[in-house]
């Protein structure tokens, strides 16, 4: 919406691929009304295939960064000397900076996640506090890429984001957008006793904190998505695994996501739109909203305290 509202007919749009043409909703940007549209279609499809082929979480994240690097290198070729102002997706930012193509241009950054330096510092602190949670130390981006992103962000004229935490990192330069709320779909009244965890089941998403809370409060948990902590992670608890494309939200008494980091809280926004209570970490980046409880921290004791009243009603 930000780009659509500010574009002019003289502008160039450079995108990974035309999502409408290739039936890829994730890439379905509106391309009408631009002077020209450049795409990195073969590069994007090839690297997307390689990323999906990786089964280990750390290798998948590494493959996604390599994909962004390859796309940036391809799209940079579309930048002619007369382009003096750029609106850049954060995923491409460090690579464009290292190539030198941002120098001398006014840059606006569209941000959807914390800077890599901040993100990795949080994971490092959590890994130090909880050495038993091995996935907290899974992957770290190369130092040169982290430094390049920091330098590019420092040089950027404007930071555009709907994320509350990200906006707070850039006082005076951040333009905070509203999250795109899904269409409200209120549910029929019926007894619901399960707590939904949108997942995936991994430490950075708060899986360990919820596991301890479920044990302490005798909760039924709907686990959505992949289990990346190992097949016996939820053993001994009242847990049901459900497919992400199922109607699991209709079964949930509440949605709980005590994440250390959260980039795209689409599931939490969908739950709020449906009137489902949400308990989440500050990393969700959502401004105060009816039905939203934001945790001061994502430790088990804090989550147990927040869930205690709800657990009493469920029993």
Predicted ranges, named:
Residues 49-58, 109-144:
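Acceptor-binding helix/loop patch of EC 2.4 sugar-transfer enzymes
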Residues 70-78, 115, 128-158:
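Membrane-proximal helix-turn-helix segments that form the acceptor-binding/catalytic region
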Residues 185-205, 211-216:
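Conserved donor-binding/catalytic core segment of Leloir-type glycosyltransferases
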Residues 246, 265-273, 284-288:
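Short alpha-helical segment that forms part of, or immediately flanks, the ligand-binding pocket
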Residues 253, 275:
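A short alpha->beta transition loop at the rim of the catalytic pocket in nucleotide-sugar-dependent
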Residues 260:
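Aromatic "clamp/platform" in nucleotide-sugar-dependent glycosyltransferases that forms part
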Residues 277-280:
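Short hydrophobic beta-strand element within catalytic cores of glycosyltransferases
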